[in-house]
Amino acid sequence: MEQTLFVRDPGKLSFTLPANAQLIVGDALNPKGLYEAIKGHDIVYANLAGEVDVQAKNIVSAMDKAGVKRLIFVNSLGIYKEVPGKFGVWNQNEIGKYLAPYRAAADTIEASDLDYTILRAAWLTDHDEVDFEITQRDEPFKGTIVSRKSVGALITDIIDSPETWSRANLGVNKPNTDGDVPVLD
């Protein structure tokens, strides 16, 4: 499998570029550069920050123009106020003011004709484990944490079987981590 890494700042990469990868330095806020990076590919995986609403519009447009249909887009928990209880209140207090662009990004993607999977991950840990469960868009979010390795495993599963989780919007968390706040040790 060949891959193209489209990054704003290659200095932030903490790994050696794999032999099957090419690096393109660019910005998802630049539609032309984004199109050039996307054309000819089968799947787009996006894990962004900042103006994610504008970036999502640009990605959808570039994918449409390039004829690429499969998108995996990492978003944030809480965009639908789907996080229940004290943890939901805590989460809203911590990141609620940042969530509007993430919600707009999800809305843009869901309104498109793309074959998308949106992943709303719980608070991320660096635990060396793959242990996760999934909730659907309209279900209450479960748990408070999930390992980056778990989210990566789910993304890899979707890339390996692109027909899975088609046009799905999923919450991802570690089972049995419900609580009032995430334990991030």
Model-derived features: positions:
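Oxidoreductase cofactor-interface core, primarily capturing Rossmann-like NAD(P)-dependent enzymes
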Residues: 1-16, 31-35, 66, 70, ...
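Bulky hydrophobic/aromatic packing residues
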Residues: 23, 56-57, 132
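Conserved residues at beta->alpha junctions
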Residues: 7, 28, 50
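Conserved Rossmann-fold cofactor-binding substructure of NAD(P)-dependent oxidoreductases
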Residues: 18-42
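NAD(P)-cofactor binding segment of oxidoreductase domains
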Residues: 43-74, 102-104
